[in-house]
């Protein structure tokens, strides 16, 4: 059994076919082996989603199909990204700011050395996070205690969450491509954006949708894991404290937790306990203001004096105006 596993791992020729060049610090075969393992996990989950998709088309509810779509997309994006990552593709070389990670023999002669930066993982996060945020919103809206959901509030909150999350992903990407200390400016901006975004998520989930129980625990765990991405970035692309292999293991574990385990849980929760809420444009969680009770003042109108009723066939007789009577007397 061990010989078979060893033989299988020895078939990994990614670094031989796509060798890192012009780099002092890059992933090794051990790092690539780990990335292929994560790739296989996402591939297995992807196949499960494909089978579930065909089952849901025939026997599943609409909510199951709605939840299955973002979960499938997340897994597909990560499957694609880890194939690229494990194949030693989708990277560029950037000189490190600090000389914490050293090599016995420098290839480039630069001090600090040139570090391998995988921009492909940022692209995968950019594509996956909006789908995950939509799935979180869907699960909270369909499994919570609220039966009436404001569509405008939902779109407003979800838009802020998506834009804020994409902003911190782009901030970390730009910061990783800068060799000077200015990279930490982008890191700080991204961290502030993530803090504001998580504030919006908490307000929406815990106060508006009233997410409780194990769903709330899973959401809080996911929000804590997000900050581990920033810690990993500071140790790898930012601070050059850990080797690229350690970075690959760190990010691989985080991605498995956020983009593999959590979407599976949300999909199961929606399929088991979800119910379609009523959507309205004004209902739900709109705040009450005192001015809402003040009705617009209606313009004053002069009441019309009703004409006296007359019998059928009776000719209406109009009395002459006083001015007309005076004119007739003067003429006489």
UniProtKB/Swiss-Prot annotation:
SMART domains: Bac_rhodopsin. It holds the Pfam family Bac_rhodopsin. The chain crosses the membrane at residues 35-55, 66-86, 122-142, 158-178, 182-202, 216-236, 249-269. Keywords: Membrane, Phosphoprotein, Stress response, Transmembrane, Transmembrane helix. One of its GO terms (cellular component) is plasma membrane. It is a multi-pass membrane protein. It comes from the Eukaryota. The keyword Amino-acid biosynthesis does not apply. It is found in: Membrane. Residues 322-332 have a biased composition (Acidic residues). Coiled coil: none annotated. Residues 1-34, 87-121, 179-181, 237-248 are extracellular. The modification Phosphoserine is found at residue 308. The keyword Phosphoprotein applies. The modification Phosphothreonine is found at residue 331. Residues 290-332 are annotated as: Disordered. Residues 56-65, 143-157, 203-215, 270-332 are cytoplasmic. Belongs to the archaeal/bacterial/fungal opsin family. Present with 7800 molecules/cell in log phase SD medium. Probably cooperates with other heat shock proteins in the translocation of polypeptides through membranes. It may counteract the altering effect of heat shock on the plasma membrane. This is 30 kDa heat shock protein. It comes from Saccharomyces cerevisiae (strain ATCC 204508 / S288c) (Baker's yeast). The lineage of its organism: Eukaryota, Fungi, Dikarya, Ascomycota, Saccharomycotina. The gene is HSP30.
């Amino acid at each position: 059994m061990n010989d078979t596993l060893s033989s299988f791992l020895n078939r990994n020729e990614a670094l031989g076919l796509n060798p890192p060049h012009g780099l002092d610090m890059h992933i090794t075969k051990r790092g690539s082996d780990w990335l292929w393992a994560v790739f296989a996990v996402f591939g297995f989950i992807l196949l499960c989603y494909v089978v579930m998709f065909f089952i849901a088309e025939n026997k599943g509810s609409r909510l199951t199909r709605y939840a299955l779509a973002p979960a499938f997309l997340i897994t597909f994006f990560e499957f694609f990204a880890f194939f690229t990552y494990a194949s030693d593709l989708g990277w560029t070389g950037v000189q490190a700011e600090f000389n914490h990670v050293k090599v016995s023999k420098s290839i480039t002669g630069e001090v600090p050395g040139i570090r391998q930066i995988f921009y492909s993982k940022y692209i995968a996060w950019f594509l996956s996070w909006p789908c995950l945020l939509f799935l979180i919103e869907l699960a909270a809206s369909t499994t919570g205690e609220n039966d009436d959901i404001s569509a405008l509030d939902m779109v407003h909150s979800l838009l802020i969450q998506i834009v804020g999350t994409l902003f911190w992903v782009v901030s970390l990407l730009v910061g990783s491509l800068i060799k000077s200390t200015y990279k930490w400016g982008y890191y700080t901006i991204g961290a502030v954006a993530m803090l504001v975004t998580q504030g919006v998520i908490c307000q929406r989930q815990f106060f508006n949708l009233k997410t409780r129980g194990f769903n709330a625990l899973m959401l809080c765990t996911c929000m804590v894991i997000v900050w581990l991405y920033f810690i990993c970035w500071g140790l790898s692309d930012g601070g050059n404290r850990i080797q690229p292999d350690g970075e690959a293991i760190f990010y691989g574990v985080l991605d498995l937790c956020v983009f593999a385990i959590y979407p599976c849980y949300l999909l199961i929760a929606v399929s088991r306990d979800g119910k379609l809420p009523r959507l309205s444009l004004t209902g739900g969680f709109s705040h009450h203001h005192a001015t809402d009770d003040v009705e617009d003042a209606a313009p004053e109108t002069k009441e019309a004096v009703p004409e006296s009723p007359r019998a059928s066939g009776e000719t209406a007789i109009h009395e002459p105006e006083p001015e007309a009577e005076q004119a007739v007397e003067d003429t006489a």
